[in-house]
Amino acid sequence: MTPEASANWFSLCWFAWIDPILTAGYTRPMEKDDLYLLQPHRCSEHLGSQLLAALEKRRKQRQDYVEANPNKTDKPAKIPPLMWAMNDIVFRYFWIGGLLKLLADVGTITSPLLVRALINFGRDSYNLRGDRDQAPNLGSGVGLAIGLFLVQALCVFLNVHAFNRGFGTGIILRGALIQAIFQRGMNLSTRARTVGGLGVSKLVTLISADATRIDYAGQFFHMAWTSAVQIIICVALLIWSLSYSALPGIAVLVLMSPIQTAITKRLFALRKKSMVWTDKRNKAVNEVVGGIRVVKQFAWEEPYSVRIAELRRKEMSFHRVRLYLRSLNLALAFATPTIATVLSFVTYALVGNELDAAILFSSLSFFTLLRTPLQFLPIAWNAIVDAKNAADRIEKVFDAEIQRDQIIRDCSATNGIQLEDASFTWETAQAADTAKPVNEKKGQDSPSNEKETPVDRASTLDSLNLTVPRGTLCAIVGGVGSGKSSLISALAGEMRQIAGKVTLSGSTAVCAQTAWIQSTTIRNNIVFGNAFDPERYRYVLEVCCLLPDLDTLADGDQTIVGEKGVSLSGGQKQRLNIARALYHNSEIVLLDDCLSALDARVGADIFANVIAGDAMAGKTRLLVTHSLNVLRSCDWIVHMEEGRITEQGTYAELVESKGRVAELLLTHTKDHFEEEKKEPSKHPIDEIQETAESILDAGSASNRNSEASESTTTTVNAESKDTSNAEGVTNKTEKKDLVAPPAQAKSKALMQDEERFSGSVSRTTYLSYLNAAPLSILLPLFLVAVLVFQGSTIMSPVWLLWWQNGHFGLQQGVYMGIYAVFGITQSLGLLSMGVIFSTFTIKSATTLHHRALQRVLHAPFSFFDTTPQGRITHRFSKDMDTLDNIIGEAMRTLIGTIVQVIGSIVLIAILTPYFLIPVAVILVLYFWIAAYYRSTARELRRIDAGLRSNMHEHFSESLHGLVTIRAFGNVDAFIAENCRRIDKQNRAYWLAQTCQRWLSVRLDFLGSLLILSVAILVVASRFDISPGETGVALSYILTAQSIFGWMIRHAAELENNMSAVERVLHYANHIEQEKPYHIPQVDDALEAREWPERGEIRFEGVEAKYGSSERNVLDKLDLHIAPGEKIAFCGRTGAGKSTLVTTLLRTLELSAGTITIDGIDIASMGLHRLRSSLSLIPQDAVIYSGTLRYNLDPLDQHEDATLHDALQRTSLTDLSLDMTITEEGGNLSAGQRSLISLARAMVRKTRIVILDEATASIDQETDVQIQEVLRNEFDGITTLTVAHRIQTILHSDRVCVLDKGVIVEIGSPAELWAKEKGAFRALCDSANIRYQDGEWK
């Protein structure tokens, strides 16, 4: 627990309770374990609950007001309920901070009154220097000096603790908001996530950007009103000091106020405009990184780089103007008091007043002190406006519709699943099966209200009647887009039920079509928050065929599989998915086409042993499948079309009815209805007709005559279950040490730890950042601007002193004019510094963004396999935002303060040389304290950045797996984990902010000692220095003392923020790169001869391995593929099929051997030339949000006619090119996503086409059409097909069977099938494929 909870008042005052952390960080690099635990009332779970309760209360108050005042509710509340709720949970803590800030500001602004008294003391003493006995008592001067010191010291403590509460409020609200957003996000309805626009990327933006803006506003909120109080008091005191002469200066303040307000508004407008492009750029980067495999395999790196660069250019065009305007605003804020001072003093002199030193220099102090509130007032209001808009955006999450479980769960129900006239709707932005383009009218995407929303379009699933008794296996079949997966989603509670009744007998587990895998260990993915049972766990591994896979992994089940399971094959991910559902031990298991990603043999084992076997015996199972050969083992079969159940019944009943299922079986069945003995004497061709007849006649022999009707509820005969194929687990893998005992389980991370630098930021980092801009031009200009600004700043009070003394005997007008010139040049110098550094910031940030993006786009796949997507996108969002908005300004301010510190020391030392003694001592203390602080602060910032990324990764990953998490009932567990990660990050964040307060209280207290030393010196030298010189020294140190502290703080803060530069530079300079993208001489020659001309491929002695592994995944492989040949690759998961494809695309480089295409070694050419010459249809379809046209042709290179043709050839004619596709293709079925991926490849005209499990998620009827298209359209095109579904490759010219990276068989399908003990024949037997089942070659 943090020592703050038990610290005494002195320790709390000085923040001494954090000393142990600072000592630890000073002596060694800090680690996460060094961080203190948060106090319970600061934990996110507590805060999130408080916020949600306060929000509910405020909304109820608003609702009561609306009901009581129906005529006053036309306009929305000026302050939204969320902001009131945030105020409620921090009210006491926050507003006590406001009171402290007010007292500190009042004390600061009245300090010049003591300065005036000291100057009067010095004047009286100086005037009586000849008669020192009559001079004022030294004690009174010392008393005034001590009084000034005490006021300043008190203001230091008040100010630091006010800021501490402001920063603390920001942290509290940020943690509460992230937790509340996550909790709400995990319960949002599908409608809210699609139509409401609250998808994963939007919610991530809310926690990373909007919650941070509210955090930032907490730090500056009180300045918005205390600054106004300061200004009012200061103006009143100026009128008291200068009488009516102060009015011209005050008029300047009044006149400049609307100008600064207008600039602030313009800054806000520019911020909003730039954020539009920032969001677009971040979204583009996110989509490119998320779909990097497609980008690289299609050689789209350069077009996407150009696209992102153009978005960046538009973003920076607004950002450039914004930075220039901000520089102007700061210059005006600095210049306004100076101009006001000049006008007031000139007026004061013109009306005949004597230039009294006490009046002049105390008034000068008032005007100078005005700079702080004038500078921070627009910043504070800008932060508040930003926060208000952020709160408005966040509140939409709490306004949005939540998932309402209308499903009845009755553990005593006889039936496992019962649907009675049930209708469901997705209510997405665009129906997946409609050809109508989206109507993009204004307001269409507005978030839904939490109240139930009327249905405004046809439901996706209509009037479903289905009864599945407990313990039965029900298969769902139908074409692509028929509603099969939607039915699974409906039963999982993801679709909105609009009619009818749904009853389930217990808990559910879901196997989604696309397996959601966490970036954690294999064990954690399977156990998924349940209690660990070693025996059951091992049994699950065995029946799901995972033990052989664990045998190949060095860490067994403790292997971390990476983000989205990147280290696993598609089959392994799906088996992990099935294992998770099996281990969960739910009453009902919903399986959405989970066999399609498995090879034939493994799929047959999984089906026999798990789905239809003992493993899931007694459970109610709903299996969506395209594998019609498994239907005989199912108790009940349902056929769907256009969201309706068109047929249902037992296998025999459906065959007898001669409906749609019988038609499918007639064409594609893999076995007879009755088990027949094989007759070797018959020629396979002669059996085809007999098979067709037996299918249609089998039903007549059955005694079951019941018919399935879509309007009549039909009950499955629970006793009809055929368990003949449930043979149990055979040939169990010998138990090896693949499953680590819980006490010894240690995972080896596949994901690389986030790059964390230790020690101080290197000189190389600063130089690299500086050299990213044209420094040779900007540096001289900046030095000139600094000299002009600082020279004018120093000379301004000196000239005022000379004017007061009449030093040169000049006319009053000359003194006035020169004094005014110094004021103007100060402003111009500051403006020039701001503009030059803004230009530097833009140039440097743009250059580093471009370099980092280029390195990422050309990084090898291994980089993306071991680096979470969230971490990569974080570099281009949060870290790049730091470069855009913070680093340049921090560097400019640091340089400015260093120059001001030097000028202050020189000026005061000229007046009182002994000042060099205390300032030297205090500067040593400054730098010692800073050195003691900076190592800890730097490490805390780095730890905070790492933990922040970790929290964001979990947030994003969880929302991507929302359907699975909700189906398994694990929402609470993930919410608790999110709390844990927020708290872990806040432990570092809170300590980092507290360390800054520790530094501030010490530096500012030393600044008060500087004031004391100058005051004592001028009191001690009262007979030797004039009142004017006393005034200059005191007024200058009063404002300059804070600059000493700011110099150290800015140096530390700059170093802390430079960690973002370190990370971006790591991406810009040190990411491993692929082989050359272009080899101009070779590539140009190949392009000139239109290579490849024929499509002939040769693999000669090919060896390949992943990473540092010693095992070859391809071992001395030799293969010749003739031009135009159709060759298929099959084999068990992990046999090397997909690896073969990766070597052809060179996403995995060979360790030995060569691959040639048309006689050219592919290693000799650039990657762009190679990959752009091939077409790949990948296993996992990558779909982007946007239009269908954009997904087919993201680079806009083809005519619509070409795109329509591709849609027609892939049976997607029901879709419009202008239809909107939601995030990750959420409004498309998995089959439709695969078909779009296929159509995308068809748009490219290449001589070689690769299909990597491209049709696994497509029903067999559509698959037949696609295969026909591939045969006809790709005639003469070399085609390589990787498939688990054996029947899809029977028409291939040759089949190559791989095992452990070696070709074990190769030949035509017919030749290999004839080998009764061959590997291919075994795969066919596992899939129940017989000769008459396909078009054999």
Curated annotation (Swiss-Prot):
Residues 1-23 form the signal peptide. The keyword Glycoprotein applies. The keyword Signal applies. SUPFAM superfamilies: ABC transporter transmembrane region, P-loop containing nucleoside triphosphate hydrolases. Pfam families: ABC_membrane, ABC_tran. GO terms for biological process: transmembrane transport. Residues 438-455 have a biased composition (Basic and acidic residues). Residues 432-460, 699-751 are annotated as: Disordered. PROSITE patterns: ABC_TM1F, ABC_TRANSPORTER_1, ABC_TRANSPORTER_2. It is a multi-pass membrane protein. Coiled coil: none annotated. Residues 700-718 have a biased composition (Low complexity). The chain crosses the membrane at residues 94-114, 138-158, 220-242, 247-269, 331-351, 359-379, 769-789, 817-837, 890-909, 915-933, 999-1019, 1028-1048. ATP binds at residues 478-485, 1131-1138. Keywords: ATP-binding, Glycoprotein, Membrane, Nucleotide-binding, Repeat, Signal, Transmembrane, Transmembrane helix, Transport, Virulence. GO terms for molecular function: ABC-type transporter activity; ATP binding; ATP hydrolysis activity; ATPase-coupled transmembrane transporter activity. This is Multidrug resistance protein fer6. It comes from Mycosarcoma maydis (Corn smut fungus). The lineage of its organism: Eukaryota, Fungi, Dikarya, Basidiomycota, Ustilaginomycotina. The gene is fer6.
